[in-house]
Amino acid sequence: MKRKYPPLEIVAPAIFALVFMVMLIYSKFEPNVEDVDAAYVREHSGMPGYVVVDARPEESYLGKSPRPGVPGGHIPGAVNFPHENLAGRTDIVAGLLAKAGITKDKTVIIYCNAGVLSERLADQLVRRFNFQPSRVKNYRGSTVEWVQDPRNVLLPPDHETGFAEDTASQRFMGK
């Protein structure tokens, strides 16, 4: 016996409505992470209660693999916490975040090359590690924008951060 299905003209709008409602509900739970600009980063970098985080791979942070249009190095005072470090178990990654000084009591300003990896890291801090969205900032312009202003510099390894020889990625990978 052959089953009779409703016509596509009836099913398609119902599926569309269902998908739309799921997207609408999901958007209500999106973390509301604020995008900031270079002036905000300059103003708050190094201030008590703030931490600037470079979400790029360690080689970019250290200036060993510059990209076209972006010289190597990092924003002064930034710590390195590569986005790929999020791949581990939540308890281990939480320990790495704390060791890097990325804690819930600070406002975290995250950057990368163009704001994509930093947005992902910001999203994970809010969703997975329960950081308050108001305390997580994404520098969307990141290093591409940063180097356009002659007042801004990218530094080579900075021993003040404690990450030049002992980066979060080295600890995570057991190096």
Predicted regions and their residues:
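Short, surface-exposed ligand- or partner-binding patches at beta-edge/loop junctions that are enriched
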Residues: 111-112
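Rhodanese-like catalytic fold shared by cysteine-dependent sulfurtransferases
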Residues: 2-50, 58-107, 116-175
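Active-site flanking residues adjacent to catalytic metal/cofactor-binding acidic residues
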Residues: 53
